[in-house]
Amino acid sequence: MKVVLVKDVEGLGFFGDVVNVKDGYAMNYLIPRGLALPATEGNIKHIQTILAQKERKLLREKKKAEELAKKLEGMVIGIKKPAGEGGKLFGSVTPADIVNALKEKGIEIERKNVVFYHPIKEVGVFPVKIRLHKDVEVDIKVDVKPEEK
């Protein structure tokens, strides 16, 4: 029996794939659990429209991420943290610090998008990766200075 998958099924296929399976597997497992639909013309067209909508949404998100990456490229943000003798920080720079510094410049990103190459635990200038989309990443520089007492 031919079915069109409504969800990814391990070992069988991904959303939108039309696969041929045994009748019992389709009728007793895939269809009742909402994993597949019979491969009628109407069901296939419906799934194809959903796939097209998802693809357009992904393209919009990628385009938006690329525009934001252009804004961020080459940017240097300053962060002041309490530091001891020799420039060692009390603690470290966190993704939340980066997000707050960017928010002050009018750029909104989430903490999960900030990727450190290594922990920042001292005063200086360090590169930090901002992952805006699975295909769009940009490096910014973080200038860590000791907080004035």
UniProtKB/Swiss-Prot annotation:
The keyword Signal does not apply. GO terms for biological process: translation. Pfam families: Ribosomal_L9_C, Ribosomal_L9_N. Keywords: Ribonucleoprotein, Ribosomal protein, RNA-binding, rRNA-binding. It comes from the Bacteria. Gene3D superfamilies: Ribosomal protein L9, C-terminal domain (3.10.430.100), Ribosomal protein L9, N-terminal domain (3.40.5.10). InterPro entries: Ribosomal_bL9, Ribosomal_bL9/RNase_H1_N, Ribosomal_bL9_bac/chp, Ribosomal_bL9_C, Ribosomal_bL9_C_sf, Ribosomal_bL9_N, Ribosomal_bL9_N_sf. GO terms for cellular component: cytosolic large ribosomal subunit. One of its GO terms (molecular function) is structural constituent of ribosome. PANTHER family: 50S RIBOSOMAL PROTEIN L9. Binds to the 23S rRNA. Belongs to the bacterial ribosomal protein bL9 family. HAMAP family: Ribosomal_bL9. This is Large ribosomal subunit protein bL9. It comes from Aquifex aeolicus (strain VF5). The lineage of its organism: Bacteria, Pseudomonadati, Aquificota, Aquificia, Aquificales.
